[in-house]
Amino acid sequence: MPGITETSQVTGPVLAHVIVTEDPYDASERAFLSTDLYELLFEDYANGSKSGLTLISIQLMGSSLFNEFQTFKVYESEEQLPPNTVNLCNMGNIIDYSSDFTVDSGYVARVDSLVKLDTVIISVLPEVYSLASQSQHQLVDILGGNDQHTVIRQGDYNKDINGKISLCEPTDQGFLESTTKIIVVKENSLNLPLLDQSQDGSLNYEENVKMNLEHSISNYFSLNSLDPENQITTTGVEFSVKCLDSPISVRKTAKSISVAHDSEDESSPKLVEEDISNEDTLLYAFCKTTELAKIGCLSGDIVKMKSGQCQCTTFECNCESCPVQYRYIRIHAFTDPNTYEKGCIYLNPILSFNLNNPKIVKLCPISIPDKRFELQGFHFSKFIPLAKQVTIARVSSPVTLDRTLQTLFLTNLKTYFESGRKVLSKDQLIPIPVDTLLAKSIFSTYEKLGVDDSQFPTVIPEGKPDAIAWFKVTEVSGELADSASQQFIIDPLKTKMMQSGVVSCSPPKNSQHCNWANYLGCGQMFSFPNVSGVTTSTFEYAKTLRKLIKATIDPSRLVNLQTTVLLSSLSRAIGKSLLVHSLALECGVHLVEIDGYEVLNPSSESKTIGTIRGKLDRVVEGCTPLIVFIKHIEALTKKSEQQQKDSLAVKINELIDEYTAKPGVLFVASTNDSDNLSDELRAKFKFEIVLGVPSEQERTLIFKYLIDFDQKTTPKVTEGTRELSFAPRNDLSLSSLSLQSAGLTPRDLISIVENAKTLAVDRVESLAKHHNVSFENMVYSSGGYIKFTPEDVEKSINTARNKFSDSIGAPRIPNVKWEDVGGLDVVKDEILDTIDMPMKHPELFSNGIKKRSGILFYGPPGTGKTLLAKAIATNFALNFFSVKGPELLNMYIGESEANVRKVFQRARDAKPCVVFFDELDSVAPKRGNQGDSEGVMDRIVSQLLAELDGMSGGDGGDGVFVVGATNRPDLLDEALLRPGRFDKMLYLGVSDTHEKQSKIMEALSRKFHLHPSVDLDKVAESCPFTFTGADFYALCSDAMLNAMTRIANTVDEKIKRYNEELPEKSQVSTRWWFDNVATKEDIDVLVTLEDFDKSRKELVPSVSAEELDHYLRVRQNFEGGKEKKVVQENGQTEHFSNGSANNHITFGDEQVVEAIDENGNSIIA
């Protein structure tokens, strides 16, 4: 409509040029924008329709040290700045890098407002702590609060207080106000900037920067003289080789200008444009800027590279250690500052494995007299000839042999060569990423339509690759201008290309040093690292399988091992398939995988075998080395109760023999229940590896992988858009997460992290709504990431436990504290000595020393045995398993013992853990006294004894503590009470003093509202010494009930009197009276002394005095007072009444008794 103009204001990221300056007259941080950029981002401010504070958030590009958006105040636009430019003035963390700063671009976004910070934590050194711990108001003024609008950023170093901003809440960046809580903490090391002062402290900042810059320039020209003799090294410069984790973009102009000479007049140069935008980026290498001077070249130069194994005095040699003398590469300098290592050359993994993964290489500049500064403009074609014809063969693998994937990987191969002028050499491997899901979808769609392969689409979306189709250059021909390099340029318009034949070779090994899978976008798999701990190593099962794979594919082994491995686990989602995939990549082995449920045909065994052969025969015949992996193998052959042979299992055994007869073939199968597998098939596997639930250290490594993987996948920033990405907040502790997630599987840990991200998004949205700020501004305030906090992860873990605890059997930590246990101080000290020592100092038990992990509580009922066991789990942050006797019994033979094994296996999976056997006398009575004909109870006791022996060992059982409780220890099997099992017996009796009784009531009534007149000591003095802890619990509960009844009666009387004053139709209900009339006194329940007296008079003790005497006699029998006889050889008898333990030993016909005195010394007659 006329008179209305539409504006398109840009608020998303804009790529701009960045310069950094320092103002000696004004030390405040600020940003200046060029006029055009200011009008683009702040059009409403530029035309005067809006005024006030303007802010931008900028992420500097090219350096890993600046991977987050930082917010700055924007001053007026500067007309002197070049177009599309940002001037960052006095940015302290950048200026400290001085001459090492080469970042010149970044993404800029508009920020409308920042939130006020609630909390700021500042770390300072101990020597300045007293100075920094000033009043709250002074700290706010120093940091720039109170309407100064100074942006406080987490991670910045503040020179005014010599401290580092360690944490900001609720966002990483914001403004201070008078209500902001500032916390100053002491830190021994702050990782402060290194260029604030010189090492000896004698130079100021400007002199230090000037000296470093002059030294760098003089050092470069001393090594890079224009004298041809000094310009070129004869043997090359050695560098260690490292591989890049992901591709690095290099800024390339479409036309590069170089200098050439006219053939008629060589003295008159002319400019020649050469296109280098489409050259092969796989020949790009990177190093730190300081390393270029050692080589004698500039960033972007073409240099020669050869293996460092050669020790010849000349670079261009012809020795046997260098079959290929050298290769041409283009060297680039990393953007400074960076965290890359000095003395290293960084190659892409594809170039590295095609060079056989050299550890050391030598670089040498190209010798072209009088043209030293022209090499940046040279194309590879100046040194590498054009190939006339090239032949490429498929590498035989499960991917290239799959017809459903053929169309896609051939299309991707064509796209690969059309994207630029590639440089190849003979026997070079070419990786082509493939999205298998996309390829199979296209194939199935067009196959249903009856379309030929030739009519399949030629333009296919890129997709997300999850597999690699390998190709190998078998033949390349052309004029070798430089026979030493054996490199050829492939021009899709001039080079004749042929794809024919299939070759057999192993894929490159994928390792942390050369992670080509992650570089090609297939994702980074968990590597199952074998990290040595105090007592055990992590992922021992991965170490075992890794050894088996390497031994099977070892070409030097003359005997075919015919290796077969069964992977089993008691829980699902442990990571069996991931383990096989990861180790296949790591060891450089082809992998073919089938699912037992997919190939199973219940109606026909022959069809099942036919389907398996159709999927495996061709692959096994053409691929080597190879892992044949069948998951869910229990679907094919389950154990049968009938005593007959499983014909399908026999046929599968024949298949296994046939496949493993070929050298280099490994057969691996996985199952969730190995006991349910057919006996015939299970016996075929030579190795059986059991995967357990991750330990605490293993969970730490898994959490680290999950969180680091998110951080390594840097969000993609483009003009106007930015992908949402997540990152952990600085105070997230991996060790705390792993401790809270005991007993959970790797898939549960993945779910926890994903759910924490969802909770973080919800939290940021609610914060944005509360502060009236847009969601995008909240994200920019946290560095461009959504930061998930420890609270988010803790909520996610609790949600996972509550949702899946029944299905996965994950135990929960009870919420019983020491304050809930009254008295029993001596017992608490004994428990601390038994459990606290192995938990805090496990290294003391690493050499096989037996640890005391069994505790037996015995005594009258109601004395707090179960409560004390739960307090142990809570106090030491241990998981808690409670086992009742009847749940272990099963009518089938052998199942009861299996239940005992499963209990202890779950405890080992969830360690640190407490296994609590309540009423132990019903679970493990004396053997031989039971009336059951099958001897079930005897076998349960025997199994329990064997498991307890495993718990007390120095290996495997660490972190598992067994606690038993019984009222009748005299009924227990005597073998349970020997050292190494329940070797710590603690008697829990009734309180023998009124002081102890008072402590019990204090613990039970600590959440009560007691009347000021209540004195628990007086209440305790009126109680007999026959009251147990359960009796006192009943006493306090009845007292609370009496108080509630009294208050309720009083309220009823008040309501009755209130209604008497009202007409009958207007009388009110109890609910209305509480909502409108009731006072605080009517709601507050105060327990008075009369309530306790009434409860005590009505209470009947649960244990009589006679019964207590009986328990005391039982205690006397177990802890001392019972005389032991020792028969010596001379017939004399000695008596020992010190309560020592005696072990009877028989030598032939003569009985000898071994006695153990109080000091642990052995006395043998």
From Swiss-Prot:
Any one GO biological process: protein import into peroxisome matrix
GO cellular component: cytosol; peroxisomal membrane
InterPro entries in UniProt: AAA+_ATPase, AAA_ATPase_domain, ATPase_AAA_core, ATPase_AAA_CS, P-loop_NTPase, PEX6_4th_dom, RecA-like_PEX6_r2
GO MF terms held by the record: ATP binding; ATP hydrolysis activity
Cellular localisation: Membrane
Keyword presence, 4Fe-4S: no
Keywords, sorted A to Z: ATP-binding, Hydrolase, Membrane, Nucleotide-binding, Peroxisome biogenesis
Chief location bin: membrane
Bilayer topology: Peripheral membrane protein
Catalysis: reaction(s): ATP + H2O = ADP + phosphate + H(+)
SUPFAM superfamilies: P-loop containing nucleoside triphosphate hydrolases
Knockout mutant characteristics: Leads to a peroxisomal-deficient phenotype with the absence of peroxisomes and the accumulation of aberrant peroxisomal structures resembling 'membranous ghosts'.
Enzyme class: hydrolase
Documented EC number(s): 3.6.4.-
Superkingdom: Eukaryota
Subunit structure: Interacts with PEX1; forming the PEX1-PEX6 AAA ATPase complex, which is composed of a heterohexamer formed by a trimer of PEX1-PEX6 dimers.
Function: Component of the PEX1-PEX6 AAA ATPase complex involved in peroxisome biosynthesis. The complex acts as a protein dislocase complex that mediates the ATP-dependent extraction of the PEX5 receptor from peroxisomal membranes, an essential step for PEX5 recycling. Specifically recognizes PEX5 monoubiquitinated at 'Cys-6', and pulls it out of the peroxisome lumen through the PEX2-PEX10-PEX12 retrotranslocation channel. Extraction by the PEX1-PEX6 AAA ATPase complex is accompanied by unfolding of the TPR repeats and release of bound cargo from PEX5.
Family according to the record: Belongs to the AAA ATPase family.
Name this polypeptide is given: Peroxisomal ATPase PEX6
Name of the gene: PEX6
